[in-house]
Amino acid sequence: AVGRVGALACWEHYNPLARYALMAQHEEIHCSQFPGSMVGQIFADQMEVTIRHHALEAAAFVVNATGWLDETQVAQIAPTEALRGALRGGSLTAIVTPEGRILGEPLTSGEGLVVADLDLTLVTKRKRMMDSVGHYARPELLHLVIDARPTSPMTSESGAAPHPLPAITIEETHTRDRSTSDPLAQLDHRTPITGAPAR
C-alpha cells in the first residue's frame, strides 16, 4: 500500500473545484502530469508554482511528470526553426513534499526518473498546521457538491430520458418529402418505439 492517490493532468490543476474534490477525499500522494517540451522556461516556472502550491494546500506529496521531446522529434513535428523554438524547455519532473519542498534534484531536460522515499508522517504534520478540508474549510458556509449520478447527454422537457426513433428504411428514403428544409420534420410519420412519448 502506498497511501491515498489522486491525479490530475495539465491544466486540470487550474480547476480549483477538481483539486478540492481530491483534497476532500484526503489524497496523500497526488500524481500530476504536464506535457513539457513546450513554451520554454516560463511553462516550467508556472508548473513549479502550481505543484508546490497544491502540495501545500492539499497537505500531500505531489509526484509530477513531464514529457520530453529530443531534437529529432522536434524536427519531425516542426518544419522551421521558428516553430521548433516553441517545442523546447518547459519541463519539470519532480517530487514535492506536503511542506512545499522539492525532494532531490528535479529533472528539467532529457529522459530519466526522479525517485524518492516518501515519509507519510509529513502529511499529518502539515495537516496539524493547516488542513484545507478541516475546520479551516468552514463547511457550514462553503462546501463542494459532487453529483456522481449517471447523466444523459439529452433530456426531454418533461424530464424523461430520451427514446430513440426506429431506423428509417431504404423505401422511406425515396418517399420522404424533400420540400421541407427540416429533416427531422420528415421523421414524424414514424412510430416511436415502445415506451417513447408520441411526437
Please give the residue ranges for each predicted region:
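C-terminal beta-strand edge segments of enzyme domains
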Residues: 66-199
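CN hydrolase (nitrilase-like) catalytic-core segments centered on the catalytic cysteine
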Residues: 4, 10-114
